[in-house]
Amino acid sequence: MSGAVVFVELDTRQDTGYTISLEWDRDTGQTQIVVADIWDASLLVFPVPGANAGDAFRHPFRYAP
């Protein structure tokens, strides 16, 4: 049985209409950005390389697919 990937929230911030979170999986080292749109309740989740995680957290739409 494979283990589930569990992300830990490292940081979160509010921007106009959005909540942006940076998450990390301690077992795999994967990082991801979560962008929640507070107006329409949509959620955008995408992986980012660890080396770019800080910049992606500050500028998520540069890195969004």
PLM-predicted stretches and their roles:
Residues M1-P65:
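Polybasic/polar functional segments that serve as interface/processing modules
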